[in-house]
């Protein structure tokens, strides 16, 4: 287990308890209007900003290294999506992850298209030192991240497909379960695997 891991056994929540917690989170967002900056792909920038505004948050879309460092300090959390990359992201993404860690701010990683080109691989390797509080992706993406971060051979053994195919998964959510748990234990946060039936784990 990595030095980053802080996972402890968490209590099992009932569906009713989860609904109550989610409702409370929604109320808190509306009451506090938190800033949640994003370094996101150009395809979804408008959608992400509108979604954040719709739930009561405040949005900011950035892409330069000094912008990432600034909003990491100002915002409540940062969302990073690797769907469409610019050359400057080679500096922006690691710098923002470091700034979040230094400021004690959580950040979310969406490793869209992992395996397409060398830059995505370099970025995901780089942020291993300052891992996200939440990792979300499809099954193939989560398996690929676990393998890239060296979190054991179990993830590769469970893989049922050929890895990510662009933004699509070739693996089932069930096949990504051990990879998701390994990633969550490493980061000390949560991992969400999207699919026909989503999987969310804190590694417990």
Name each model-derived stretch.
Residues 118-203:
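Conserved phosphate/ATP/ADP-binding segment of small-molecule kinases
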Residues 81, 89-138:
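Glycine/small-residue-rich loop that forms an oxyanion/phosphate-binding "nest" at active or ligand-binding sites
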Residues 2-95, 99-101, 178-204:
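Small-residue (G/A/S/T)-rich helix-start motifs and N-terminal tracts that mark the onset
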Residues 34, 51-54, 78-83, 106-112, ...:
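Short, basic, glycine/proline-bearing loop/turn elements
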């Amino acid at each position: 287990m990595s030095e980053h891991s802080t996972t402890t056994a968490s209590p099992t929540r009932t569906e009713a308890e989860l609904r109550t917690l989610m409702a409370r989170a929604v109320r808190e967002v509306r009451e506090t209007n938190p800033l949640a900056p994003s370094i996101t792909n150009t395809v979804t920038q408008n959608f992400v900003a509108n979604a954040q505004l719709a739930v009561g948050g405040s949005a900011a879309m950035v892409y330069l290294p000094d912008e990432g460092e600034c909003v990491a300090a100002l915002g409540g959390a940062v969302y990073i999506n690797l769907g469409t990359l610019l050359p400057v992201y080679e500096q922006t993404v690691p710098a923002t992850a470091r700034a979040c860690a230094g400021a004690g701010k959580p950040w979310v990683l969406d490793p869209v298209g992992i395996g397409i080109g060398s830059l995505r691989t370099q970025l995901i390797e780089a942020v291993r030192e300052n891992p996200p509080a939440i990792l979300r992706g499809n099954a193939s993406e989560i398996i690929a991240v676990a393998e890239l971060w060296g979190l054991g051979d179990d993830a590769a053994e469970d893989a049922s497909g050929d890895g990510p195919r662009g933004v699509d998964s070739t693996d089932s959510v069930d096949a990504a379960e051990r990879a998701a748990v390994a990633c969550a234990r490493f980061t000390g946060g949560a991992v969400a695997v999207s699919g026909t039936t989503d999987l969310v784990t804190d590694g417990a």
